[in-house]
């Protein structure tokens, strides 16, 4: 072998050894950084499609959501989640030509509003995030520790005066996962060129990042279901049922 070729080969081997040594020593290599994950912000926004419809003369009342959350979810995250849901739900209805009023509770709706309103929309349910759930995958020799959601949200369309339910549906927000720790790297280097297995553990201990990722996905899932239920075809059916209920009073 020529001297130039030998130098290139030895240089490549030394570079590989330096790379694996860097992993073992915990240096901030690019691959490690990517596995740790980038920062995550709360993003409670869903793109609302469709043109602005003319006013249809109907009033819809929104009741502030009542979502119970476990202690893992910060209260300000929960409040922001609920606030964004009401705001975007109001935007969807207004774009479809409805007027919208908002109250904290059904009991606060004045009698004249009850008589005038077509529907009352109220949302309740629960949401929790479970921490440090361990799962193994023997096929890939990888162990993962995850945070995972649990919960179910309900949306009820109610006739204002009688409070009879016109329509209801639920959204399952459970089993949304975010990985916080994994065993994923193997190297073969024992100081020379004799292979030896070494497992390298990369850990992401930022539960706050995982909570944000899970809640962002849950919000998107809820809004997808809500926009489907508020389609023109569905709303016309709710209007018909609610009007018939008012006549039977």
What residues fall within each predicted segment?
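Bacterial N-terminal signal peptides that target proteins for export
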Residues: 1-9
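Surface-exposed short loop/turn segments
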Residues: 111-182
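Short beta-strand and adjacent turn/loop elements
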Residues: 60-72, 122-128, 132, 136, ...
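A structural "domain/chain start" motif
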Residues: 20-97, 200, 204, 208, ...
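Bacterial N-terminal signal peptides
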Residues: 9-17
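Repeat-unit-sized solenoid/scaffold elements
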Residues: 128-140, 146-154, 188-209, 232-249
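Short, solvent-exposed, polar/charged sequence segments at loop or secondary-structure edges
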Residues: 74-141
């Amino acid at each position: 072998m020529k001297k130039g070729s030998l130098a290139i080969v030895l240089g490549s081997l030394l570079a590989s050894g330096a790379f694996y040594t860097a992993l073992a020593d915990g240096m901030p290599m690019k691959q490690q950084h990517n596995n740790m994950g980038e920062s995550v912000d709360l993003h409670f926004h869903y793109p609302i499609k469709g043109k602005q419809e003319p006013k249809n003369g109907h009033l819809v009342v929104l009741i502030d959501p009542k979502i119970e959350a476990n202690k893992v979810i910060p209260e300000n995250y929960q409040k922001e989640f609920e606030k964004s849901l009401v705001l975007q739900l109001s935007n969807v209805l207004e774009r479809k030509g409805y007027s919208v009023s908002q109250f904290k509770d059904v009991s606060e709706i004045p009698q004249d509003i009850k008589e005038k309103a077509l529907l009352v929309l109220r949302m309740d349910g629960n949401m929790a995030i479970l921490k440090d759930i361990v799962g193994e995958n023997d096929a890939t020799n990888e162990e993962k520790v995850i945070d995972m959601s649990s919960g179910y949200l309900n949306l009820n369309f109610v006739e204002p005066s009688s409070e009879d339910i016109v329509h209801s549906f639920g959204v399952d927000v459970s089993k949304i996962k975010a990985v916080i720790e994994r065993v994923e790297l193997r190297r073969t280097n024992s100081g020379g060129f004799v292979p030896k297995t070494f497992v390298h553990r990369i850990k992401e201990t930022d539960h706050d990042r995982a909570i944000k990722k899970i809640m962002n996905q849950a919000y998107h899932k809820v809004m997808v279901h809500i926009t489907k239920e508020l389609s023109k075809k569905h709303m016309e059916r709710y209007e018909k049922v609610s009007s018939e209920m008012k006549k039977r009073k």
